Amino acid sequence: KSETYKSYKIVFDKSKRQINVDTIRHIFTFDLLKNINPPSSVCVIGDGKCHFVIGNLLTFPNSRIFSINLSETLINDYLILKEMKILDDTEIQVIENEHDAILENKKLILIPSHIKEFLLNKRIDLFVNIASFQEMTIDEIENYFRIIKSNNPLFYCCNREYKKLVGGEELYFDNYPWGN
């Protein structure tokens, strides 16, 4: 069992939360990411149930976290963090429009996906996407890649090699817009 696993286990045990396959995927991710220089800012696209936010707080405690997701998922994430007593309300900022300023004392910035353009050119050091691109259309994925590239960050992406969406659109990992 890795140190990352042990850290997650302590936090999850305190809140009577079980480690599941999604948590394990994030533990493996942080076991890889902890080998990079600690980023000052990280953006997670499509975190679910705060798996990434929690791991980031444990692995890179000095980094600011940008979490972008559907509004209803962000509400759920906020409630999880509140219940687990991981961050105080004073450390969390919710972005309401593209022109909001990032407040200096905020640790976690929550961005509803309908205003994703807020993330353009924010000098974010690391972007992470684990299993949420496979739920988006290729047009939406291309929009995220444009935002990611505008920040010139490291990018960690873990999604299926192939997925057919409900509407019939087929996604191929190798066909994501990786090039510059």
Descriptions of predicted regions:
Residues 151-163:
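Conserved beta-strand signature within the Rossmann-like core of class I S-adenosyl-L-methionine
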Residues 1-37:
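Conserved Class I S-adenosyl-L-methionine-dependent methyltransferase catalytic core
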Residues 49-61:
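Conserved SAM-binding loop of SAM-dependent methyltransferases across substrates and taxa
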Residues 128:
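A conserved beta-strand element that flanks and buttresses the S-adenosyl-L-methionine
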Residues 135-148:
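A short, conserved alpha-helix within the catalytic core of class I
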Residues 80-120:
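S-adenosyl-L-methionine
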Residues 64-70:
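Conserved SAM-binding motif I beta-strand of class I
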Residues 39-48:
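Conserved class I S-adenosyl-L-methionine
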